[in-house]
Amino acid sequence: MLSVKSIPAFNDNYIWLIHNNDNHCVVVDPGDATPVLECIKEHDFILDAILITHHHHDHIGGVPELVRQFPNVNVVGPENEPIPTLTHPVGDGDFVELFDEQFMVLGVPGHTNGHVAYIGDEKLFCGDALFSAGCGRLFEGTAEQMFNSLQKMAALPDETEVYCAHEYTASNLAFALAVEPDNDYLLRYREKVLHLRAHGKSTIPSTLQREKLINPFLRTSEANVKKSVASKVQDSTEVEIFTALRRWKDEF
């Protein structure tokens, strides 16, 4: 089993550092090199690879400096995104070997056209595609693409740990409760999250099991969710429900 450390960056980003028992590590979406280098130095890690989910600067800004410090590092990322530092472009269905574990690449377009996620060792590194209690904005892709991407991730085992790239859980839960104000699990979980954040603690990782209970974008088949957007849709297909939810969240 691999271990994962969170490296906070900027206002609410998480850079994920995956390591094994012999001090080798991989980092995911290093938007800033400085905290990564500090963590590597503190723990005497050796950086083997960088995994990138998409091309936004807060996910790749630290890559050039990390490559300068570790010239032999492998830079793995989406083949259909403008990321000049890649050494190993990957796409949906490809595999990446990390510490003798096979991580599969999932194409999850929506937030960006080429966005990917990485799943292995019961851990999902999903960038800005899936958040705890939310999902990424549609900067490049379509609502249907994002809906299908979320369904692809939701089909993974319930015990899968979800490592998203931002601490948005509290604000996402406020929206989730606007959608489902009578969801008792949501109400209880919000209290837990507010307590964690008040003490400066992270709410990530989540699990897919939890997300299926709290995330409105994964609950488009639920009667209460459908009812909440009934006035905003012409038909009640799950894609239409998702589209209405995403539009509502953009304005929330």
From Swiss-Prot:
Record keywords: Hydrolase, Metal-binding, Zinc
Cofactor remark: Binds 2 Zn(2+) ions per subunit.
Enzyme class: hydrolase
Pathway annotation: Secondary metabolite metabolism; methylglyoxal degradation; (R)-lactate from methylglyoxal: step 2/2
Domain of life: Bacteria
Keyword Zinc: yes
EC number(s) from the headed UniProt entry: 3.1.2.6
One GO molecular-function entry: hydroxyacylglutathione hydrolase activity
Catalytic activity, as annotated: an S-(2-hydroxyacyl)glutathione + H2O = a 2-hydroxy carboxylate + glutathione + H(+)
GO biological process, one term: methylglyoxal catabolic process to D-lactate via S-lactoyl-glutathione
UniProt-annotated binding residues for Zn(2+) 1: H54, H56, H111, D128
Cofactor: Zn(2+)
InterPro entries to which the protein is assigned, alphabetical: Clx_II_MBL, Glyoxalase_II_hydrolase, HAGH_C, Hydroxyacylglutathione_Hdrlase, Metallo-B-lactamas, RibonucZ/Hydroxyglut_hydro
Binding site for Zn(2+) 2: D58, H59, D128, H166
Role: Thiolesterase that catalyzes the hydrolysis of S-D-lactoyl-glutathione to form glutathione and D-lactic acid.
Subunit note: Monomer.
Similarity remark: Belongs to the metallo-beta-lactamase superfamily. Glyoxalase II family.
Record-given protein name: Hydroxyacylglutathione hydrolase
Annotated source species: Aliivibrio fischeri (strain ATCC 700601 / ES114) (Vibrio fischeri)
